[in-house]
Amino acid sequence: MRRGGWRKRAENDGWETWGGYMAAKVQKLEEQFRSDAAMQKDGTSSTIFSGVAIYVNGYTDPSAEELRKLMMLHGGQYHVYYSRSKTTHIIATNLPNAKIKELKGEKVIRPEWIVESIKAGRLLSYIPYQLYTKQSSVQKGLSFNPVCRPEDPLPGPSNIAKQLNNRVNHIVKKIETENEVKVNGMNSWNEEDENNDFSFVDLEQTSPGRKQNGIPHPRGSTAIFNGHTPSSNGALKTQDCLVPMVNSVASRLSPAFSQEEDKAEKSSTDFRDCTLQQLQQSTRNTDALRNPHRTNSFSLSPLHSNTKINGAHHSTVQGPSSTKSTSSVSTFSKAAPSVPSKPSDCNFISNFYSHSRLHHISMWKCELTEFVNTLQRQSNGIFPGREKLKKMKTGRSALVVTDTGDMSVLNSPRHQSCIMHVDMDCFFVSVGIRNRPDLKGKPVAVTSNRGTGRAPLRPGANPQLEWQYYQNKILKGKAADIPDSSLWENPDSAQANGIDSVLSRAEIASCSYEARQLGIKNGMFFGHAKQLCPNLQAVPYDFHAYKEVAQTLYETLASYTHNIEAVSCDEALVDITEILAETKLTPDEFANAVRMEIKDQTKCAASVGIGSNILLARMATRKAKPDGQYHLKPEEVDDFIRGQLVTNLPGVGHSMESKLASLGIKTCGDLQYMTMAKLQKEFGPKTGQMLYRFCRGLDDRPVRTEKERKSVSAEINYGIRFTQPKEAEAFLLSLSEEIQRRLEATGMKGKRLTLKIMVRKPGAPVETAKFGGHGICDNIARTVTLDQATDNAKIIGKAMLNMFHTMKLNISDMRGVGIHVNQLVPTNLNPSTCPSRPSVQSSHFPSGSYSVRDVFQVQKAKKSTEEEHKEVFRAAVDLEISSASRTCTFLPPFPAHLPTSPDTNKAESSGKWNGLHTPVSVQSRLNLSIEVPSPSQLDQSVLEALPPDLREQVEQVCAVQQAESHGDKKKEPVNGCNTGILPQPVGTVLLQIPEPQESNSDAGINLIALPAFSQVDPEVFAALPAELQRELKAAYDQRQRQGENSTHQQSASASVPKNPLLHLKAAVKEKKRNKKKKTIGSPKRIQSPLNNKLLNSPAKTLPGACGSPQKLIDGFLKHEGPPAEKPLEELSASTSGVPGLSSLQSDPAGCVRPPAPNLAGAVEFNDVKTLLREWITTISDPMEEDILQVVKYCTDLIEEKDLEKLDLVIKYMKRLMQQSVESVWNMAFDFILDNVQVVLQQTYGSTLKVT
């Protein structure tokens, strides 16, 4: 159709022209807006924005939809389409330079203007909230506001400091009566007088539960109108959430600025050293210079009086070093004395951790878990608490008052699962003021405060630069570039604008509910909190009291039951099903009794939530807080869960919340409309299933009383400043000693060591915004796997220094150091008999076969990315061990040992060769062991020719076998080798040495499977004795002659491995598998579906059957892709004189090119698909052997460079396995994919993209 004809007809459509259509559309939208506004108004409306018409450009927070609702409620207009004549204000948070030029002269305002106008109850001036000024021609200044004049009375972000100085009494009164929170927008540091810093810090730390480093966000106050206020820890009831919802969006935008608060609580001491008094004096002097009346503005800080500091009476120190701290130095020093400022100090680490809140919490959790475990082990079945409950039962009333105040008749107790979640209210605060009645009911915070909340701005520090960096990082979802410092730093700004102090970044560990109602949150910086609430009372840490109360809490719970899961020092999960059945009490009665006893014992309040599972119990606790209880009954679950935000679900963080929001999902009710298939498509099979179940209140997680320790670590990223390499080295050794102490305390040893270093990012300020903090950093990590697990500080320290030297860092830029130890094993076990991962005895599974579910219990917990080693084995007469740089991890697709007789017990053979044995007690320097038959079968001349270390191991194994033979007669040898082989460790070389032969002098050398002569390392060959060199040359000549006269016998090679003397037996415990060029296997092991087809397939010819041991070893170790295409050299078999081997004789001249990769004989893709579909759909629990065959097939495809078919096979398996109702199939697919990706990474340096 021609365009002209279309236009001609369009002109007759009733709209005349395109402009007419748009005008009609805009008019319709305006009418719709007015009609919606009339319905939205419900008594909370106003006319604040009368005459204001906004247009939202781009992403804002609150969102455009939220702003539209706000304009409806408060008399404004919302334009979907921008009109230069009608739109009065453009709302935006970020605009490109071209758009700024296009909108030059228009009012482009940040959304905080709307939010704060509503909070103020009147229309504020838009000037402090302009996104850019008319003088700005580029976007570099978008983050700043124009400087407000000191006489400007508007309560915008530029003059909060002036309000605090001139109208403190008015503000405090207003905060107490209206719960109003003054939240700043972004502002320039180039402001007058004391305004310098308030605009920066008032936005920070408004996110619930975040521990940050003083980085604000311009939209920190804009989540006020999203209809829900998630509390900082889910502790507030609905009626308690009366504070404007300033913080929900800030919780998404506020950056997790510092890992130091996550790893160790630096703010517990602020690491104030000998300069502490100088800093406080400087703060006092600068405050007095800038505002002589400031001391009168803050009622908590009189300078010369007998005052209450932290609620206790203290005489203010007279003299120049006295401070106005809300926490006296003398009082604080008792709880947290000063910590050395230099990491080179010998007491730095111990003092640091002794004052770290999070370190104490972590240690307490471990101690409480062990406490519960000890109670369970020593339990005699007597619970004093239950006896009290039984007595209470006899006199209890038939009615009970619920937490809502309703009277309800007690129902007969049910015996269904019932979980109770106990959580102390404002734990640190409650403990801190339990003996301080004068502080109860007042806003209180636990922190290591800094006086009035201000500290000097150190030269070189640039908080705005750090803030901008983290803002970009959060918004972009990745690390941002460092902004140009020239745009942020003004060398004269500090002196010209009076910016010589900043707000304190001492973190608030916990705050009371009275403080939370005023906008203060856990994790907020103390300086910011003091601006929100000048009457905020600070309480110092008291770790001894916290531990005492935590112990009392758990002892109280243990008096009722030992089925307790220690969540934290102030939180526990209890399975009360048995208690209710025994005492005949209702959940509400039991919860009330527990709460009352906890309060009597600790003088602290606890909230209790009860549900049928852990998820519901936790959600019920949110509703119960503070100091309440709530029983979420099964019949109420559906209605209750629908109204819960998805952010309340476990595992839903900022990233997942954003993704769910993009799908239009905010509540669990919205999430219930999503099918599991769609959720799994969007979030993956496991996460999708989790969301599908959690949003319906389904949770099958048990109350776990014991938890396996996976790692031990020690990190410090506060106060790290080095000037010399030797200082860093000494610190690493000291930290290694700390690791040793922790390993010894947990009774574990570790094998995998990781060194983590935080290095100042290029371009970042040398002086950080937080005193002693790490600032903007890059994280660098190195990992090494030791031969044996250790807890020795010297070994750990040596490994750390080696890795540290490879990093080649600028010492002065180091900001954090951490050591992690993984692959833990118990200390009380012999390392040689305890592998680095759990072992599963084959006897645990019938007939030597078991499901992959059992295997994953072993393999899933620990993955090993081994230190790079390359090993060439030297055994008998021509294999020599030479170490290189790659450790081998083997995947055993089939048994490595094959009985000679078909009558041999298959189950026994499989059970002994499934790679899941406990390792032998002797290990070589490369974590390899040599297995030998009984001493009578050894050839002493061969033994003497072995390297000393290898010979020593063989002798030790013989000694062990002789010791065992006295108590247990060995089974009849097969192939000249004992079938009762000792258990194997990872990467075991099985050396089967035949009996000495009296005839055929060349038989000994011919029995060793030689590599192709081209594969022999000339240096290794030259190092051999001359006599041995001659024998090898003769063996190669003989093999060449035999190869010329022999014929191919494919059937024999298919059923029997060509090298019965040397097998690589791999432990299946290694999850990461290396690529195998040649693999020896047994088709007679287990008659699984894939193996059945394998046996009946004429194409069944194992590639490993015709490869030499050297080829086999290289295929496992080198991972260098397929070798040259010339046929592999065949093994020269002369076994007639070897007892037990005559039945295995075959004289192939040489192997032809290996057949195409096949899966149980299926080569074509359609045949493979059919076989896979039959396998997955007919079996509910896949066998280990089947999975390993699939892994081998995939690795063969990689060797053949047939990646296209590999991609199709992997994706087809994924579809089939994810459709299976058995979750074990998903685990099986993950196992297969992990191994394939490892081989791909090693071969091609990349992985397969599986969507």
From Swiss-Prot:
Residues 44-131 form the BRCT domain. Pfam families: BRCT, IMS, IMS_C, IMS_HHH_1, REV1_C, UBM. Mg(2+) 1 binds at D423, D570, E571. Mg(2+) 2 binds at D423. It is found in: Nucleus. Residues 419-653 form the UmuC domain. Its main location: nucleus. Residues 206-236, 282-342, 1035-1096, 1119-1147 are annotated as: Disordered. It comes from the Eukaryota. Residues 1119-1129 have a biased composition (Basic and acidic residues). GO terms for biological process: DNA replication; error-free translesion synthesis; error-prone translesion synthesis; response to UV. GO terms for molecular function: damaged DNA binding; deoxycytidyl transferase activity; DNA-directed DNA polymerase activity; metal ion binding. Changing E571A: Abolishes transferase activity. Keywords: DNA damage, DNA repair, DNA synthesis, DNA-binding, Magnesium, Metal-binding, Nucleotidyltransferase, Nucleus, Transferase. The record marks K770, T783 as: Interaction with target DNA. DCTP binds at residues 357, 423-427, 510-516, 522, 570. Monomer. Interacts with the DNA polymerase zeta which is composed of REV3L and MAD2L2; the interaction with MAD2L2 is direct and requires that REV3L is in its closed conformation. Interacts with POLH, POLI and POLK. May bind ITGA3. Interacts with FAAP20/C1orf86. Deoxycytidyl transferase involved in DNA repair. Transfers a dCMP residue from dCTP to the 3'-end of a DNA primer in a template-dependent reaction. May assist in the first step in the bypass of abasic lesions by the insertion of a nucleotide opposite the lesion. Required for normal induction of mutations by physical and chemical agents. The C-terminal domain is necessary for protein interactions. This is DNA repair protein REV1. The lineage of its organism: Eukaryota, Metazoa, Chordata, Craniata, Vertebrata.
